Amino acid sequence: MDFDEIDTSRDPIQRSTPSNDPILIETKEGHYTLTPKAEYQLAGVVVSKETYSYGWNAEISPIDLAIAWGKLAEPEHEKYVSFSQRNRWYFYEYKPESPLDNSYIIFHSSNNHIIPATENISLALKTIQRKEKVILEGLLVNLKGIYKEGKVTWNTSLTRKDTGDGSCEIFYVTKIRINTDVYE
């Protein structure tokens, strides 16, 4: 990563992963297998952030970030579109006079369930504020596991053009840049 201005104008970069080797994660309450589906890099503006401390997915993914890119990340569009999150979903509302339509908003924003690869990344995620520019790098993953004797499954989206249940990115983050600070 260079330290020029973070370019939020481009679409996320998604590539085939060179390895599907599983990533194993053990927690106090469960154990999980992450299966890499794609390498992923997302540069954008944080439009909403929600933290979780309850349930199996909070144990492994304590933070969701709603991130916008393209024209949607430009400050002049903030007055037209508002974002919020709850219960692992993100929501947006836009004013009728918005120059960006519903399709543009869908195709240029995403709700990312963040699985931090390291404690350092976990700590950095806690500092992120709304309106900050970030670059996240890592893997989109599917998850299977056991939590308190019950089976759990969580599958990532592999497109930015879907909506509704299952349209979020399950993002195993291995590197994050917040403004000029990089964490691994």
Give the label of every model feature segment.
Residues 1-184:
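OB-fold and OB-like single-stranded nucleic-acid-recognition modules
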